[in-house]
Design a protein with these regions (language model features):
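Catalytic cores of TIM-barrel enzymes
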Residues: 1-200
Length: 200
């Protein structure tokens, strides 16, 4: 029987592994909504009722696929993620929160929301409520929609690619060191294939 890492590498080499490799939660593309993760954990008996699940990607409200769930489902991939999430704050200092349907979750400390008059919820960039909201979850919704915060109108006749690069730059030495340490930890502590999520 192949290890998870060997299974993925075998498939990437266009050879047939012992079974099809499975990625669930290794990246935002393969994530699962936190309410579904909660229901799955309950169905598998992994948690007592009411145990919250961490929201690891708050824009889509993706839930953590923790090691016990990875093992229960035979997941072969683990994510190497940035220190900050889509909204620009770290996934740390967890605090309780509830979805519209009542599902208990844990969100990062800077997950700062504000209710709107229509029952929707506003989210703020980097958790900074002094800034204009950057996303909105509709009343009864499951995830956030980005808000247009454009300051000046688009001049379609004079587009310049540099105008779209202000939020992108080289990865800092600190961030590279974080990725190096985290990749090493995941390699040593798991037998999973490591999927790097550098953002961008």
């Amino acid at each position: 029987m192949l290890s998870s890492r060997e299974r993925v590498l075998t498939a990437l080499e266009h050879e047939e592994p012992d079974r099809v490799p499975l990625d669930l939660g290794g990246s935002p593309t393969t994530g699962m909504h936190v309410s579904t993760v909660y229901a799955l954990r309950q169905a598998l008996g992994l948690d007592p009722p009411g145990t919250p699940v961490k929201v690891v990607e708050p824009f889509q409200m993706l839930g953590e696929i923790a090691p016990d769930l990875q093992e229960a489902l035979g997941v072969d991939v683990v994510g190497l993620c940035s220190k900050t999430n889509f909204f620009g704050f770290k996934n740390e200092d967890w605090k309780p929160w509830r979805l519209f349907d009542g599902t208990p979750v844990l969100v990062p400390g800077k997950f700062n929301t504000e209710p709107n008059d229509d029952g929707s919820i506003y989210m703020y960039p980097q958790g900074d409520k002094s800034a204009a909201p950057c996303a909105r979850m509709p009343r009864g919704g499951f995830y956030f929609d980005a808000l247009d915060r454009q300051i000046r109108p688009v001049d379609w006749d004079n587009l310049d690619v540099k105008d779209n690069l202000e939020e992108f730059g080289p990865i800092s030495s600190e961030e590279l060191e974080f990725f190096r340490r985290e990749a090493e930890r995941l390699y040593q502590e798991t037998d999973k294939a490591i999927l790097a999520n550098f953002g961008g």
